[in-house]
Design a protein with these regions (language model features):
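ATP-binding/phosphotransfer module of carbohydrate and carboxylate kinases, centering on a glycine-rich
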Residues: 1-65, 76-78, 96-106, 119-129, ...
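A glycine-rich, Thr/Ser-enriched phosphate-binding loop motif common to dinucleotide/cofactor-binding enzymes
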Residues: 109-119
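Short hydrophobic alpha-helix segments
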Residues: 28-30, 85, 155
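A charged helix-plus-loop insertion that forms the helical arch/lid used to bind
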Residues: 79-90
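A short acidic/small-residue loop/turn micro-motif
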Residues: 31-33, 89, 158-161
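Short beta-strand segments
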Residues: 7, 67-71, 110, 134-140, ...
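Acidic, glycine-rich active-site loops and adjacent beta-strand->loop/helix elements
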Residues: 113-115, 139-141, 306
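Short, charged low-complexity linear segments at domain edges
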Residues: 145-161
Length: 319
């Protein structure tokens, strides 16, 4: 009983053979070559599907289904990628073409963030729940919503863009063109920008900060710089972390008040802070949520599937 998950990214295509226990039996990848025609990208996807089957001595005919997690607007009803800013897909029937190349195996598609959220709901931090949300704190803030046991993507399949809820009126400029989007305050990119700004502020004011020393040693500023400095007793590092977490909390409270999910799982680089992060934000979130102390509380958890979320989430799209 095997399924195949295809994690289609702007940089790499990763394909995994997933068993009935949601474990990846075999995984292979190749550069996407996003500048190429869509047909050529699908050729590589098909080849990887055959390769993982061959490595595990599984016949492609015995595959229950294949799922594709793709960036952009994915119409899961028709199997068409309506639009992707990172890939050459416009009204592109990706599911039909891949299915034909695989000998008729059923192919499902969805947005990559939705697929990751579905993976956490089926096999990860939200397993056993009927409603959940997953957010990914990386270059941006990705979001996926599971409502009544189904992926929520809106009537036009472009919903669940949680990173673009506005939390600061006329705030920081976002890549989407608007101002004040949550991802400009709560992504790993935003955290790095806050760290740089605080280091510059300290230099102007003649204050010392361990963040400068850490950056000199490592050669770069990362999402860990402020957290590591804070843990070492650095006041400026603590200021960065406190500011960052306040924005993260604001966005999470908004999500809870709108959807009241059973579980919110947090993935992406910032989630590597682990249980400390959950313990730090949990009290403020539930103090601020609507109906605090009266309604059942949403649980906040670290996502479990990590870097395999795309493959596993895609593989279980047919469930």
């Amino acid at each position: 009983m095997y399924r195949i998950g295809v994690d289609l990214g702007g940089t790499n295509i990763a394909v995994g053979l997933v068993d009935e226990n949601y474990k990846i039996v075999c995984k292979k990848s190749t550069p996407t070559g996003a500048e190429r025609e869509g047909e050529l990208i699908i050729e590589d996807m098909a080849k990887l599907c055959f390769d993982v089957c061959k490595s595990a001595n599984v016949d492609i005919k015995d595959i229950i289904s294949v799922g594709i997690a793709t960036p952009g607007i994915a119409n899961h009803d028709t199997g068409v990628v309506e639009y992707s800013c990172n890939l050459p897909f416009r009204k592109f029937p990706i599911a039909q073409i891949l299915s034909e190349k695989l000998g008729g195996v059923k192919v499902y598609i969805d947005n990559d963030a939705n697929a990751a959220a579905w993976g956490e709901a089926v096999a990860g931090a939200a397993k056993g729940t009927n409603s959940s949300v997953m957010i990914t704190l990386g270059t941006g803030v990705g979001g996926g919503i599971i409502n009544d046991g189904k992926i929520f993507s809106g009537f036009n399949f472009a919903g669940a863009e949680l990173g673009h809820i506005v939390i600061e009126h006329n705030g920081r400029k976002c890549a989407c063109g608007r101002r004040g989007c949550w991802e400009t305050y709560s992504s790993a990119t935003a955290l790095i920008n806050m760290t740089k700004e605080k280091m510059d502020e300290c230099q102007r004011e003649g204050r010392t900060t361990l963040m400068t020393e850490m950056t000199a040693k490592s050669g770069n500023i990362s999402g860990r710089t402020a957290f590591d400095a804070m843990r070492a007793g650095d006041a400026a590092g603590k200021e960065v972390v406190d500011t960052y977490l306040s924005y993260l909390i604001t966005g999470l409270v908004n999500i809870i008040n709108i959807f009241q999910p059973e579980v919110i799982s947090i993935g992406g680089g910032v989630s590597n802070e682990g249980q400390w992060l959950i313990d730090k934000i949990y009290p403020d979130i539930h103090e601020q949520q609507y109906g605090s102390g009266i309604v059942d509380e949403t649980k906040i958890r670290i996502a479990q599937l990590k870097n395999d979320a795309g493959i596993i989430g895609a593989a279980v799209l047919g469930m």
